[in-house]
Amino acid sequence: MSEPYIIYNDDGWSSYMRYPAPMSPEEVVAVTVAPVAGTGVKVYQFCALGGHAVNYNSAFLPRVGEMLPAVDTLHVWRMRETLRHLESLGTNPLQIVSQTCHDNGLACQFSLRMNDRHHTYRHGDGSWYFPELLSPWLDANPHLLLEDRALDYTKDEVADYRLRQIQEVLDRYDVDGIDLDFTRFKPWFRPGEEAVGRPKMTALLRELRLLTRRHGKTLSARFEYNPQVCISSGLDVEAWLAEGLLDQVTLGGTGDHTPDAPSDWWVRRAHAADCKVFPGIEGQLHWCPGSGGGGGGLHPGDGIADGFGPPSLEYLRAVAANHYRSGADGVSLFNFTCADGPFARAAFDELAQPETLEGKDKQYVAALWPWDAQIFYEPWSSARFLEPDQFEAGWELQLADDFELQRCLRHDFSAVLTLEWKGLNRISDFEISLNGVALAWNGYEYNHYDHGCWNDIVQYSVPSFALRQGANRLALHRTAIYPGFAGRTEVRKCVLDLRFNQTITPGALN
């Protein structure tokens, strides 16, 4: 296995929309490649969103915002002005980013969202949410679109459209590879046409493989963590890997974050075909149901502790460490350029050094929501619950740390388990255990309103001897019934904060 590294995906417009316009080439460098140059990031992915209205210069695709008769949203105006200014200087973001990557020893991949739907979203009054992403090609080809105006990949003309886009990028720009983002968004075909569309999508992948090889470039793709979801949507991913169509796979979700999604299935099949795997971590975490368009407070938040914002360094370490135990070649960072708040730059080095993650503080989170839930937009039912007459429930937490090693080294560590309860009358109504060891309430409780009811955040002390590397069984035992209550008792958040004592105390009695 080669040295691990990080893939950094720039979401395509936040790097220009969030800064005063017009931006100079030097200013573009300062907010894109410069922050990650010289770190564990070795691949920079330049995202072109859905590829209908683009953020680079194209001979046949409009630039973002150029189709609007007037612009009344500042961030769209900023991007349009910056793109116009750069064009007047004879350059554009893709040219700037790719050149800067090469100047700093990074590979630059052009990443295309295969069915991005931002251009399909509407307000309640029917007006477009992102009119800056509309394109004449979409208006001229309604017969090639699904009902929501996304692409229908059963149509041969859609494959031709994508091939033309990628051919142009390979001809005009000095990129090192093409990346196909299949997490944005299924469906690819009309309902019931997956069997018809599957071979057509495979044919497109084969053509793109030949095209990139002729140019001496790599071909990679981003998929949802759950392979069965990909396969059922009409993506023959297992065959693609076996056929050697891809050099690199990154993983992610269509929802907000996937802190404990396994990557084993992908690692086994990809490595057999000499393809590398980089599980993904989202740069923006959401748990607040009412803050759909952004943070609701007056200061940046921590994605887990505050319900909205970027992940903590401890969260990043935990996710990465578990994937390295599964044999991942590194990690990928997605949408960090649009994070609502700061995140630790140290992550760009630490996450590329799996051996240094051992013995460092971590925040392990269990995903209790559906795979594709937009947590902050919609109510959702937890996957972990007890019916009114149910007395036992449980699930596993995957912990990457070698606790036996830490004990042998006489390193002190401690852990706190935080659960959010919905439908809990008293804390004593449930006994909690980890690997058969009873956990005691540590005195912390926070009652708050969420998803239509009052929920309770409760913390439990976890004895260090209860922790194991790998699977840890968390069990719930009901000790009280609620006569006349017909609702479920749900666990809606499950977070284990692991802390290592970094001090040295000379002298001991044992």
State each model region's role.
Residues 27-54, 171-177, 245-249, 323-330:
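Catalytic domains of carbohydrate-active enzymes, especially glycoside hydrolases
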Residues 407-417:
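Extended extracellular/luminal ectodomain segments enriched in beta-structured repeat modules
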Residues 157-276, 315:
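Active-site neighborhood of glycoside hydrolase catalytic domains
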Residues 43-51, 248-259, 304-372:
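Substrate-binding cleft of secreted/luminal carbohydrate-active enzymes
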Residues 41-87, 186-191, 248-251, 260, ...:
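Aromatic-lined carbohydrate-binding/catalytic grooves of carbohydrate-active enzymes
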Residues 3-23, 68-99, 103, 109-168, ...:
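Active-site-adjacent "subsite" loops/lids of carbohydrate-active enzymes
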Residues 421-506:
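Beta-strand-rich ligand-recognition modules
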Residues 16-17, 22-26, 49-54, 87, ...:
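Acidic-and-aromatic substrate-binding clefts and catalytic sites of carbohydrate-active enzymes
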